[in-house]
């Protein structure tokens, strides 16, 4: 008897599974709020060199700035430089206000970086880490690097949580992730220096990686084949809710410390909710924990209204399933490359996940230059994800996972490519293409999560998810730094995001299709297929169920 047959007895989709999805909704909402938080935490408002002694009369401000600040080629006052000596401006009324007339210098006046710090426009943000620690001009790289540090932490956490949850269980490691994220988030909000903030945010990313690695498999491993797609897409809408909620919370809370607290404190009720979250019965059986699996399966049958008693779900039957699925030795990342088909799957998934994350976060963190303020842009980027979910739901059921993933990545690449052809004056077209690209990239992200969870066997599912998430977060950590390439050529970041998305689209076509296939439970289930193109062709040992 395979686990799918046990699941058929107790109900593969019902109140038990819906309750499980609801309990695991909170981490799906919190993830985008933390991952996209740099949009607000690192925002750089308009700024200029601090000029002590500026006239109180606002009507003379322009003349005062003209005397002290150079202009950029576009005519704006410089944000990073001031004249070494104030210029003498003829016909100015500043002299009559008791201000020094400055010096009349021959040639081009010399400039210096702001020696007395900066003054910031606080009309949009009362405080960000950029204004708190002057992470502008020569220090702007440190401001961008905070996102890289965070995703580097997620990268490390993906490895750790993927491996440890396969060894010690999904539920236990989810508790570790919740507690760690809560404590580290609170410490981050209390940071007294940039160094302290960078370290604690990196560690917070490590903790939050547990959410990304554990939640989706913990949902899917309780679902039958026929409902995996709808449940996967449904649960991914919680991510979209988090994206839109972040726009609202960011609009209401303009101080970075309080904003960080607002997105961290919900971890507390999440910890309490774990009391009702069931451990994966699939995983329990692979570990030989028959009694625990029996208890959860009976609970599932009771909530789903299935008349399964002790005789209908005997411990002897479970012991046979456990004996067939028990892991002889602990899984390791080497196992993902030990056999031909798993090696093929792992290498392709690594490329795909790098491209998905690199393009998604490159698009998501670029909220400037669209003719909208940061809150409107964030809300619009969140709203477009809803129709993206519908696109995924319809496409994966008819076209399959592989073509859907490749198509959405191609759409992301084309949207970025067309933006390169649109001039900066065409704000409406630029906004439309940015929103379209964001929608395609979100659809690719949703499909990648569902697809990857179905490709790996139960005994290595968390390990495989951890590896691909590791490489994906590497892409996410490089995306903010790629934005610095605009100093070389303004269009270079978009070209990089689009090019990598195109490479990922081509690689996705090399993956096996999982539409209509039951979840593989052992490495042998994966390797038994000799054809590299599909998990649903001949010699499939697992029962096929119409999606």
Swiss-Prot record:
This is Solute carrier family 22 member 7. InterPro entries: MFS (IPR011701), MFS_dom (IPR020846), MFS_trans_sf (IPR036259), Orgcat_transp/SVOP (IPR004749). The keyword Cell membrane applies. SUPFAM superfamilies: MFS general substrate transporter (SSF103473). It is found in: Basolateral cell membrane; Apical cell membrane; Cell membrane. Residues 521-547 are annotated as: Disordered. It comes from Sus scrofa. Belongs to the major facilitator (TC 2.A.1) superfamily. Organic cation transporter (TC 2.A.1.19) family.
